[in-house]
A protein has these predicted regions:
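Surface-exposed, low-hydrophobicity beta-strand/loop segments enriched in small/polar/acidic residues
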Residues: 1-176
């Protein structure tokens, strides 16, 4: 179980595993030591695997693919850094199949995107924006990471990891 550090005990976790006991795995690795980003990495930020066990936020750069969802905070703006406080660079990314379901709280998803309704027969696939936040905008078969299951409120979404199963999707809702 991940817990916020004592330095910021009131900070809410922005990613909550709903179905993950057997459906998802926290994949251990390291945050890219050369990482230089001007945004916070929050639990729920889409991450890419650079090489070996080294991760960085997925920003949609050409030649990269999303790998999973961040489990930890590296958020200087919020005053929480669960990586540098350990001094090791250890980092964790949630990976899983299409049975892994997570609740994601804002601001860990793109609140400025045009979010479709989840009613009806269409599937709404998600990718990441240039800050690694989940978004329905710009989805392609190569960059999809999850499927939108529900939007319980304006600051909460429920997603199902869905990296590779596009066989029954004829149109990537929210895509280009």
């Amino acid at each position: 179980m991940f817990r916020p550090p004592l330095s910021n005990p009131t900070q809410k976790r922005t990613l909550l595993p709903l179905y993950a006991n057997y459906q998802a795995t926290p994949w251990a690795g390291f945050l890219d030591p050369d990482l230089d980003v001007d945004f916070d990495i929050l639990p729920g930020t889409v991450m890419q695997r650079l090489y070996g066990e080294v991760f960085a936020p997925y920003t949609g750069e050409s030649g990269t693919v999303p790998f999973g969802l961040s489990a930890l905070f590296v958020a200087p703006k919020l005053g929480v850094n669960e990586v540098s406080s350990s001094g090791t660079g250890l980092f964790t990314v949630w990976v899983g199949g299409d049975q892994a379901v997570f609740e994601v709280l804002a601001p860990a998803f793109d609140i400025e995107a045009t979010w479709p309704t989840t009613t009806g027969p269409s599937r709404v696939m998600l990718t990441a924006n240039d800050k690694g936040r989940l978004t329905p905008e710009g989805v392609t078969a190569e960059n999809v990471i999850a499927e939108l299951i529900d939007i319980p409120s304006t600051d909460k979404i429920v997603v199902r990891l869905n990296r590779l199963d596009l066989s029954s999707t004829t149109d990537l809702a929210g895509g280009s």
